[in-house]
């Protein structure tokens, strides 16, 4: 938890000793998932934060291939932590960037694959004697992945949700469709498809205008994702929780943070 607070309060600080960067690898059945450890200079042991990127083709630095969006937000987070004596591990998700070789066919990918990958990274860090504690920090979709992965992992001592949804994914999608002022027929179609998917049933007759969102190959992933309610999941997190949310986020609102708070009143 202190890791998140240090970042928020002192991102612009500069360490007197340059941080050290190490390339690290997590081996999976599909291939290697690659990441980077950023270690504060001049220390032998320290806390470490595992940083989980958000949805879509977002890399370990927080940059997305969609729209060529480059903000280096997660890289800056890692540097801010290092400046405050805290190590971090960030990684490219399977199928993304340097971890492209570990990608699965879209039809075979499940939300739990990402959760299992993060669990693997937690176990990796747990074996490292250089780290005194582990905090898991997830952004956007990574927040839900993190809160699932950190459970039953005794070395994890804290969890941070950064702009994490407080509602099931299908509710977020429906809210976005409404906010975009789509015709009522579109909103009803989206709600109908989501209704089937959240009950574990694939939909064969998806209209052409919704194929990009509900194509047949992505429906199994959506089914695996829709079954999780972040408000319920966060209630089962047994370590201290920090919820961070901006007011100008166009996808996740302050209301989502409030939903998470209701699920975990001690946060």
Task: Enumerate the predicted regions with their spans.
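N-terminal cap/lid segment of alpha/beta-hydrolase-fold proteins
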Residues: 16-44, 48
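Short, surface-exposed "cap/lid" segments of acyl-processing enzymes
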Residues: 43-45, 49-81
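Conserved alpha/beta-hydrolase
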Residues: 72-100
């Amino acid at each position: 938890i202190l890791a998140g607070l240090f970042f928020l309060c002192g991102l612009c600080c500069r360490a007197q000793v340059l941080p050290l960067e190490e390339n690290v690898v997590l081996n999976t059945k599909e291939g290697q998932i690659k990441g980077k450890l950023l270690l504060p200079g001049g220390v032998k042991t320290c806390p470490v934060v595992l940083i989980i990127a958000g949805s879509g083709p977002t890399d370990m630095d927080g940059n997305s291939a969609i729209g060529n969006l480059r903000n280096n937000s997660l890289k800056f987070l890692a540097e801010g932590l290092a400046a405050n004596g805290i190590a971090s591990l960030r990684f490219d998700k399977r199928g993304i960037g340097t971890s492209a070789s570990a990608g699965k066919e879209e039809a075979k990918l499940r939300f739990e694959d990402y959760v299992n990958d993060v669990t693997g990274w937690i176990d990796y860090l747990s074996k490292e004697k250089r780290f005194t504690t582990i905090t898991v920090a997830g952004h956007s979709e990574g927040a839900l992945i993190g809160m699932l992965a950190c459970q039953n992992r005794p070395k994890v001592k804290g969890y941070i949700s950064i702009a994490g949804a407080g509602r099931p994914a299908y509710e977020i999608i429906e809210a976005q469709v409404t906010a975009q002022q789509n015709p009522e027929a579109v909103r009803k179609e989206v709600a109908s498809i989501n209704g089937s998917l959240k009950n574990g049933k694939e939909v064969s007759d998806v209209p052409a205008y919704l194929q990009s969102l509900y194509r047949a190959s992505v429906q199994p992933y959506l089914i695996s994702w829709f079954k999780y309610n972040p408000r319920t999941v966060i209630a089962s997190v047994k370590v201290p929780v920090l919820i961070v949310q901006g007011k100008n986020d166009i996808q996740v609102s302050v209301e989502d943070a409030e939903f998470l708070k209701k699920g975990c009143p001690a946060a």
